[in-house]
Amino acid sequence: MTHWLDKSLAAMRGLGWAKSPRTHELTEAKQGVYHYTIGPYSSEVLRIAPGDRVIVETRDAFEGKVKTEEDLPSKVLRMPFVNPQNGPIMIEGAEKGDVLAVYIESMIPRGENPRGTCAMIPQFGALSGTSLTALLAEDLPEIVRKIDVDEQGVYWSKRVTLPYKPHIGTLSCSPEIDSINTLTPDQHGGNMDLPDMGPGSITY
């Protein structure tokens, strides 16, 4: 059955938004290798048209290596190989200088018993002094907190349930020349960690 948008005046004039959207799935198997840098040197794993929907299976920033509260990041992670990213996703017709709009429809926790992770990591993050951001206070001890989570809430404890308000930490266009660490925010986007970049939002 033909979608009404395909026969619209806007579609006949070639406007990208006037095409019936297709839905693509980018599973872990289809993604294959996840990336720790963002740049023009990785081959596309998916090609879509403007207006298409993409369902993406992502990994957490620790790539699933922090499974329990005993898995200290300093022991199980190999920096800077963290914050793995999906993609690249090629948008047909997109050219240098274009403005892209990404609408985030929904975010659903993965797995039978999804758990979030909070952690204090030595030499990493806003609460820990680094060579670039020295603090007068002593470093906080390294600690991991695993938290049950579903679409109804974030279960900090038996008495405390926090609202479920997910957001995408890293979203990016490819820089023209550079290959940039996925932990870095910059003009291309990257690791922005914006709480506003969640379901119902549009990122330009």
Show which residues each predicted segment covers:
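A generic structural signal for residues embedded in beta-strands
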Residues: 56, 99-102
